[in-house]
C-alpha cells in the first residue's frame, strides 16, 4: 500500500478516469430522479422514459454538451471523495484493528464496514459544494426541464451565485443526505471488493491481475447500487432545491413516498446501475494500477522516514 498521501492521489486520478466514461449516465439518472417531483404518479409527465431514451432525447435536444453538463465539478468532487475514500480507508482500518485487536493486519467485516463508511463520509463532506453545483448543472435543460432549474454558466459561476444568494450554508445544502448516501455506499464498496477478491483467489485460484480486479469490482458495484440508490435519490432532490421544498432528509423522504409512492425512491435505478457498475469497475481497477505507480514513485524518490509521515 502507498502512503496516505499517495493513496489519496491514486484514488483521485482513478476516479477522474472513471467519471469521464460514466458522467453521461449520471446526468440521465439525476433527471429521472427529479422527474415528477412531488407529483402524483398519474399526473407526472414522463419526459425521460428510461436510460437509453434519456440519452437519446438529451443528445437530440442539447447535443453531447447536455450529457456532460457539470463535468468540471464532477472531476473536483471525485478527487476529493475518492481521494479520501481510497486514501483514508486503509489507515482507518488499521487504526481500528490495532485499537480493538492489537493487530493492524486483522481482517474484520465490522471494522472494514466502519472504516469504509467513515472514509466515505469524510470525502462526501469535503466535496459536497461541488456535488451540489454538479447536480444543478446536470438537471438544467432549456428543452425538457425537470425539477427546480438553475442556469449557471459553469461550475464556478454556480458556486459564486449560490454563495451570493444563500451564503456558506447554501453551499452545504444537502450535505447530511450526501454523508448518509456516501456512508452507505462506502461502507460496502471496499469491504465487498476486498471480500470478493479474497474469495476468488482462495476458491477459484484467480491470480492478482486485471481479471481479478474486474470480477471483484463488478460484485462491489452491484452491492453499492442496491444499498446507495434510495439515499442517492433523496440527495439529488435536496441538492437541486433552494430550501423551498424540503426541510431536511427525512422530510424529503416522507414527502416523496407520500406523494409519489414508495417506488419513487428507486427512480433512475437502472441509469444509476448503468453508471455505477462501470464507474466502480474503472475506479477500483484503475486504483490498483495508480497505487502501484505511486508506490514505485515513492520508493524511488522518498526516504523511509519521509514515507512514514505522509
Swiss-Prot record:
What is the membrane topology listed in the Swiss-Prot or TrEMBL record? Multi-pass membrane protein
Subcellular location per UniProt equals: Mitochondrion inner membrane
Q: Where is the signal peptide?
A: none
Q: Which InterPro entries match?
A: Mito_Carrier_Antiporter (IPR051508), Mitochondrial_sb/sol_carrier (IPR018108), Mt_carrier_dom_sf (IPR023395)
What broad class of enzyme is this? Answer: translocase
Instruction: Give the top-rank taxon of the lineage listed in the UniProt record for this protein.
Output: Eukaryota
**Mainly resides where?**
mitochondrion
Q: What is stated as this protein's family in its record?
A: Belongs to the mitochondrial carrier (TC 2.A.29) family.
Protein task: Mitochondrial transporter that does not mediate citrate export from mitochondria to cytoplasm. Its exact function has still to be determined.
In its UniProt entry, what is this protein called? Mitochondrial citrate transporter E
Q: Which organism is it from?
A: Aspergillus niger (strain ATCC 1015 / CBS 113.46 / FGSC A1144 / LSHB Ac4 / NCTC 3858a / NRRL 328 / USDA 3528.7)
Q: Which gene encodes it?
A: ctpE
Amino acid at each position: 500500500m502507498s502512503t496516505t498521501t499517495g493513496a489519496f492521489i491514486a484514488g483521485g486520478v482513478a476516479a477522474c478516469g472513471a467519471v469521464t466514461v460514466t458522467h453521461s449516465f449520471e446526468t440521465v439518472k439525476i433527471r429521472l430522479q427529479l422527474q415528477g417531483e412531488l407529483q402524483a404518479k398519474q399526473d407526472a409527465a414522463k419526459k425521460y422514459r428510461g436510460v437509453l431514451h434519456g440519452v437519446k432525447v438529451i443528445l437530440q435536444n442539447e447535443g453531447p454538451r447536455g450529457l456532460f453538463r457539470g463535468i468540471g465539478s464532477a472531476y473536483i468532487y471525485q478527487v476529493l471523495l475518492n481521494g479520501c475514500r481510497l486514501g483514508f480507508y486503509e489507515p482507518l482500518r488499521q487504526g481500528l484493528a490495532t485499537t480493538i485487536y492489537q493487530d493492524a493486519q486483522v481482517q474484520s467485516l465490522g471494522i472494514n464496514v466502519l472504516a469504509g463508511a467513515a472514509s466515505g463520509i469524510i470525502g462526501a463532506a469535503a466535496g459536497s459544494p461541488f456535488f451540489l453545483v454538479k447536480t444543478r448543472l446536470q438537471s438544467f435543460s432549456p428543452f425538457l426541464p425537470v425539477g427546480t432549474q438553475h442556469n449557471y454558466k459553469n461550475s464556478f459561476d454556480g458556486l459564486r451565485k449560490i454563495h451570493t444568494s444563500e451564503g456558506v450554508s447554501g453551499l452545504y445544502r444537502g450535505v447530511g443526505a450526501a454523508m448518509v448516501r456516501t456512508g452507505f455506499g462506502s461502507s460496502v464498496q471496499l469491504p465487498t471488493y476486498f471480500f470478493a477478491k479474497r474469495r476468488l483467489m482462495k476458491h477459484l485460484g484467480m491470480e492478482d491481475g486485471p481479471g481479478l480486479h474486474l470480477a471483484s469490482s463488478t460484485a462491489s458495484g452491484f452491492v453499492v447500487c442496491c444499498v446507495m440508490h434510495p439515499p442517492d435519490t433523496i440527495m439529488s432532490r435536496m441538492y437541486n432545491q433552494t430550501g423551498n421544498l424540503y426541510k431536511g432528509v427525512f422530510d424529503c423522504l416522507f414527502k416523496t413516498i407520500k406523494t409519489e409512492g414508495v417506488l419513487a425512491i428507486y427512480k433512475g435505478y437502472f441509469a444509476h446501475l448503468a453508471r455505477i457498475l462501470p464507474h466502480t469497475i474503472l475506479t477500483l481497477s484503475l486504483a490498483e494500477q495508480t497505487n502501484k505507480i505511486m508506490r514505485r514513485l515513492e520508493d524511488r524518490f522518498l526516504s523511509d522516514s519521509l514515507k512514514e509521515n505522509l
